[in-house]
Amino acid sequence: MRDMLGLMKQAQAMQEKIQQMQAEIERLEVEGQSGGGMVRVTLSAKGQLRNLAIDDQLIKADEKQILEDLIITAHEDARKKAERLMEEKMQGVTAGLALPPGMKLPF
């Protein structure tokens, strides 16, 4: 019975930490870039596009396809950074828990 109570307290404390972490994650941003910084995207840690910056040199009609490819690459770069950032932040919250390998918490 004592073990069950301790487990419930641990679960409640973890839930509070997760809620705090979610609030912090909402405020975090990452930047991805491509083309040597000519295209930059800023994403929230959850992957929402917050800003797109394109160097003036790229805005030419005959380079439309290049620009589109660079935007996609910059977005993917930022998305990967956001994913790594969330994983790093959650490691502190889930430290000490016996989670199965590869298990991701729902955010």
From Swiss-Prot:
Gene3D superfamilies assigned to the protein according to its UniProt record, in alphabetical order: Nucleoid-associated protein YbaB-like domain (3.30.1310.10)
Q: Name one GO molecular function term.
A: DNA binding
Q: Which InterPro entries does this UniProt record tie to the protein? A: YbaB-like_sf, YbaB/EbfC
- What family does the entry list? Belongs to the YbaB/EbfC family.
Subunit structure of this entry? Homodimer.
In which domain of life is the source organism classified? Bacteria
This chain's source organism reads: Methylocella silvestris (strain DSM 15510 / CIP 108128 / LMG 27833 / NCIMB 13906 / BL2)
- Report the protein name in the record: Nucleoid-associated protein Msil_0275
Q: Which NCBIfam families match?
A: DNA_YbaB_EbfC
Which UniProt keywords are listed?
Answer: Cytoplasm, DNA-binding
